[in-house]
From Swiss-Prot:
Protein name: Ribosomal RNA large subunit methyltransferase K/L
Stated family: Belongs to the methyltransferase superfamily. RlmKL family.
Taxonomic lineage of the native organism: Bacteria, Pseudomonadati, Pseudomonadota, Gammaproteobacteria, Pasteurellales
SMART domains to which the protein is assigned, alphabetical: THUMP
Task of the protein: Specifically methylates the guanine in position 2445 (m2G2445) and the guanine in position 2069 (m7G2069) of 23S rRNA.
Keywords: Cytoplasm, Methyltransferase, RNA-binding, rRNA processing, S-adenosyl-L-methionine, Transferase
Transmembrane segments: none
Annotated Gene3D superfamilies: 3.30.2130.30, RNA methyltransferase domain (HRMD) like, Vaccinia Virus protein VP39
A GO CC term attached to the entry: cytoplasm
Length: 718
């Protein structure tokens, strides 16, 4: 009998213990990351061949305390390696763990390697070679604080590598994880199993191999014991032959196919079919291209299990689509799979609540670095389902957080706002406006409509707010927005807005290059909803731009810190004599040019200038009748000579603007600094007068956010 250790993913240790016991292991003892057990040769080989949950099977050779690299080397060089393999074989050392002296795993692996080759030299043998790709012998060393365990890896390559997967779709499950998911589900052999989002088919293939009694490693060609001197070839051949005969018997029984795999992507289905063929279970699984929204029960009056690992996104941009996917999936489960069991594995537990199903059991697990959960459900019988569907029409929403009343309040507020603001916007001939702006403190976000698109901007939560609760609230909000607006998920865009530093408001978020135009008081303006934090149009300045258009008739107009030139468009459409548009960003200046062309505004009288606005202003010798200046609150761009602070520097700016302002000219000055205070005394010294018009420039959709900007009319004193 040998002392052995089976490694597995965290969370599966107890499940592995049951499997090992069923395979004949004795004295099983669970520890974190695996199970210790004893076994004779026959059981050892049977476990290697049949274990669906083990990552590796290790034979411990050395267990000792080490306090230095010399202790490590001495422990290795003192081991009788010739009893395990000779000098002609290649080997590789896997080293995991550190302590105060062995601080790097590469150093630990090197010292183990040195000890092994030096042992052979001391015994008059040649040094065995290291092979990092295909070693004959694999040595596994694990250091936990000061305790070292050195083992012979009998598996060779990790046991999750079954050999049947030639190609996969995105984010494939490891075979060992897939097997654990199947074993933890409520599926019973001989009953139907359906995977509606099967990807490369790993869940179904693992289950089908269980049904067909196919050993997961039946077709493995290379093992970690092939060149081990302790290998018992006779016993191994016996165990392997038993596995071959079991698989043949199952095949000859002509099992009825009752595994179904669906996926929207026909390309990944082809990979799944090939994988199933390699695994010897292609005759048991039926594959079909299909969307979850059209999912139908493929069986006839049979009761079975739905098993699935739906997509889950770490990036927030995928959230609207995922909420819709899980909601639709839950609906189809209730209408098509009454009295069935369902087992869902997900890395986003909050999304599972969108199924609107009550789990009777759940398990925690890891998928690589991700914390995941598997939940088991039972679908109510059909009469209960029909009643539930009748009572859950359009106004009933799927919410994630526990406080569903607050979530319903958000939905009601949004519905009320839409009724009021949509009517107003239609009268004003607008199709870009705000629907919601942190009206409820629990839902600190903005919702903007851009034609047939919706942008949700979540303001960054304070550090004292629990991240999970904030995430749940966001899921609730998106779910409500999808339901209340009826918008398609691919037209809902989600962004997280944080406090800006320097020029970070100009940083790119994506590179989709998707532009379309919106209408604003007769102007057409290009917007881009995905590539930048801002869209190219500041909605709160809509009335300011309208006012500039009305003031611009026959005047020379200057737009400083122009952004995408939307104010210039209004001035030009208002029959300005000339326009000059200045911005430091070449990207936004090109955008401004496209805005002008979109409105058929052309000619030498419309100038676009790429420059540092403050430096350009210092050198400008032209005179203007109407100047619009909307500077950033703060900027320390490397392309600017000095930093800029609107509170600190606005009087200096006004002094320069006065110089180029004609006698009867007007400056429209605006900024977004909350608490901004105009230096009236400083203006008087410059012989300028100022009148605040902030309230007049605040449109209906921003009337609750009175501090979003401040706006001033500044003229020469008469």
């Amino acid at each position: 009998m040998k002392q052995l250790f089976a490694t597995t993913s965290r969370g599966f240790e107890e499940l592995l213990k049951v499997e090992l016991t069923d395979l004949g292991a004795q004295e099983c003892r669970v520890v974190q990351g695996g199970v210790h057990f004893i076994a004779n040769d026959e059981t050892q080989y049977r476990i290697l061949l049949w274990s669906r949950l083990s990552s590796r099977i290790l034979l411990p050779l050395i267990t000792t305390k080490i306090y230095s690299d010399l202790d490590l080397y001495s422990a290795i060089v003192g081991q009788n390696w010739l009893t395990h393999f000779d000098e002609r074989v290649t080997f590789l050392v896997d080293f995991n763990g550190t302590n105060r002296e062995i601080r790097h795993t590469q150093f630990g692996a090197m010292r183990v390697k040195d000890g092994i080759v030096d042992y052979f030299e001391r015994h008059g043998k040649t040094r065995p070679n290291v092979d990092k790709e295909y070693p004959d012998i694999r040595i596994h060393a694990y250091l936990n604080q000061d305790e070292l365990v050195v083992s012979l890896d009998l598996s060779g390559e990790a046991l999750h590598l079954r050999g049947y997967r030639e190609d996969t779709g995105k984010a494939p499950l490891r075979e060992t994880l897939a097997a654990a998911i199947v074993l933890r589900s409520s599926w019973e052999k001989g009953t139907p199993l359906v995977d509606p989002m099967c990807g490369s088919g790993t869940l179904l293939i693992e289950a089908a191999q269980m049904e067909a009694q196919i050993a997961p490693q039946l077709h493995r060609l290379h093992w970690g014991f092939d060149f081990w001197k302790g290998h018992n070839q006779v016993v191994w051949e016996k165990v392997k032959q038993e596995a071959v005969e079991l698989a043949e018997q199952a095949f000859n029984r002509k099992l009825t196919p009752h595994f179904w795999g669906f996926d929207l992507d026909h390309r990944v289905l082809k990979k799944a079919q090939k994988n199933a063929q390699n695994a010897g279970v292609s005759h048991l699984i039926k594959w079909q291209q299909g969307d979850v929204a059209g999912l139908k029960n493929p069986t006839e009056q049979e009761i079975g299990t739905v098993i699935c690992n739906p997509p889950y996104g770490e990036r927030l941009g995928t959230t609207p689509a995922l909420i819709a996917l899980y909601s639709v999936f839950g609906r189809q489960l209730k209408t098509e799979f009454a009295d069935w069991n369902v087992s869902i594995f997900s890395g986003e537990p909050a999304l599972l609540d969108c199924l609107r199903l009550r789990a009777y059991r759940q398990f925690k697990a890891k998928n690589g670095p991700l914390d995941c959960v598997q939940k088991n459900y039972h679908i109510a019988v059909r009469k209960q389902v029909e009643s539930a569907v009748e009572n859950s029409q359009e106004k009933t929403l799927t919410f994630v957080s526990e406080n569903t009343q607050v979530a319903q309040d958000f939905a009601n507020r949004l519905r009320k706002n839409i009724k009021k603001i949509d009517k107003w916007a239609n009268q004003q001939k607008l199709d870009a406006y705000r629907l919601y702006d942190a009206d409820l403190p629990e839902y600190n976000l903005a919702v903007d409509r851009y034609a047939d698109h919706i942008i949700v901007q979540e303001y960054a939560a304070p550090k004292n707010v629990d991240e999970n609760k904030a995430r749940q609230r966001l899921l609730d909000a998106v779910s409500a927005i999808l339901s209340v607006t009826g918008i398609e998920t691919n037209k809902l865009i989600l962004k997280v807005r944080q406090k800006q530093k320097g020029t970070s408001q100009y940083e790119k978020l994506a590179n989709k290059g998707e532009y379309f135009y919106v209408h604003e008081y007769g102007a057409k303006l290009w917007v881009n909803l995905t590539d930048y934090l801002d869209t190219g149009l500041f909605l709160d300045h809509r009335l300011t731009r309208k006012m500039l258009g009305e003031m611009a008739v026959g005047k020379d107009f200057l737009n400083l810190f122009a952004y995408t030139g939307s104010a210039t468009v209004h001035a030009a459409l208002g029959l300005a004599k000339s326009t000059t548009t200045v911005d430091m960003s070449n990207t936004y200046l090109n955008w401004a040019e496209q805005n002008l062309l979109l409105n058929d505004i052309e000619g030498k009288q419309h100038k676009l200038i790429q420059a540092d606005c403050l430096q350009w202003l210092n050198k400008c010798d032209r005179q203007f009748d109407l100047i619009f200046v909307d500077p950033p609150t703060f900027s320390n761009s490397k392309r600017m000579e000095d930093s800029w602070d609107v509170q600190r520097d606005h009087i200096k700016l006004m002094a320069n603007l006065k110089r180029i302002l004609r006698t009867n000219g007007t400056i429209v000055f605006s900024n977004n600094k909350r608490g901004f205070k105009m230096d009236i005394d400083g203006l008087q010294e410059l012989e300028l007068s100022a009148v605040e018009i902030s309230a007049k420039t605040l449109p209906l959709d921003f009337e609750r956010n009175k501090q979003i900007h401040n706006c001033w009319i500044i003229r020469h004193q008469s």
